[in-house]
A protein has these predicted regions:
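Active-site segments of SGNH/GDSL-like serine hydrolases
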Residues: 98-99, 108-109, 136-174
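Solvent-exposed loop/turn segments at secondary-structure junctions
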Residues: 8-12, 53-59, 97-103, 154-159, ...
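Structural motif
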Residues: 1, 90-93, 147
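Catalytic His-Asp segment of secreted/periplasmic serine-dependent ester chemistry enzymes
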Residues: 153-252
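A structural motif corresponding to the C-terminal end of an alpha-helix
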Residues: 36-44, 131-149, 179-197
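Extracytoplasmic/secreted proteins, especially bacterial periplasmic and envelope-associated proteins
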Residues: 4, 30, 34, 80, ...
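Conserved SGNH/GDSL esterase-like catalytic core that processes O-acyl groups on lipids
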Residues: 13-130
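Short hydrophobic segments within beta-strands
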Residues: 5-6, 151
Length: 252
């Protein structure tokens, strides 16, 4: 039993075959259906519940913040996904943070943070961490036997969709995404969570792995992510994320 928690990444936005939420979608080319296909091809019997909701953020606080600054946010992981994780799940994957970082930078663009934008970003990273703890606790309460595999964030400031953004916006996106990865997600390895390290994976920064919007992966991008998820599920030992790498400070 595999429950996937995520946003449009889970439904495969940007892929050649995108899935609708909550469907098995066996022919999808996002990382969730590709992961399911690869596991089935290796002989695993697998039932999939893809809980991904496009535009979703981690918690109600980020949903409210985004709506205050005119972002379309259809839901959040804690309220609309966590309660529906399959109770007999053996694997749960979580990919959170991309829409949350974009919400933070949108708020900054709308004047939030005033003269101390760094402090605002850091406060939002802490709020994200509190939400992530709530999400994990709820998932473990629903599916106590599940192996939990999470993906950290790449440095969003370096992705193609922000190539023409202002230096200030890119610096904020870097501070938020690196903060989320290093202070919230990577430390989860101490809680028996497997962390897939997109932050320090050079493939996460190759423009050829992204769709035309520069934010969502294409089939190639989702393919490499699925390969890592499958490796994490099937390996007895998966490498811990890097403590530091050049990608964390790519924007001066």
């Amino acid at each position: 039993m595999y429950s996937a928690v995520g946003a449009s990444d889970a439904t495969g936005h940007g892929a050649s075959v995108e899935c609708i939420p909550f469907a098995d979608c066996p022919n999808g080319t996002g990382y969730v259906p590709v992961t399911a296909r690869q596991l089935r091809s290796q002989g695993f019997t697998l039932n999939l519940l893809n809980l991904g909701i496009p535009t979703a953020v981690i918690g109600r606080d980020f949903q409210t913040l985004g709506q205050q600054y005119n972002r379309t946010i259809a839901g959040n992981f804690i309220d609309q996904e966590m309660p529906f994780v399959l109770q007999d799940s053996t694997v749960v994957t979580i990919f959170a943070g991309g829409n949350d970082v974009n919400t933070i930078t949108a708020a900054l663009g709308g004047g939030a943070g005033g003269g101390n934008q760094a402090a605002f970003v850091d406060a939002q990273v802490r709020a994200f961490g509190a939400d992530y703890a709530t999400l994990l606790s709820g998932i473990r309460g629903r599916a106590p036997s599940a192996r939990i595999i999470v993906l950290n964030l790449p440095n969003l400031a370096v992705l193609p969709y922000l190539a023409s953004a202002s230096a200030q916006q890119r610096q904020a996106a870097q501070r938020a995404s690196v903060g989320i990865t290093t202070t919230v997600i990577n430390p989860l390895t101490s809680q028996n969570v497997t962390v897939i390290d997109l932050m320090c994976d050079s493939r996460a920064y190759q423009s050829g792995n992204y769709s035309s919007d520069g934010f969502h992966p294409n089939d190639a991008g989702y393919g490499f992510i699925a390969g890592e998820v499958v490796r994490a599920i099937t390996s007895s030992a998966y490498p811990a994320p890097h403590a530091s790498c050049s990608q964390m400070s790519a924007v001066p």
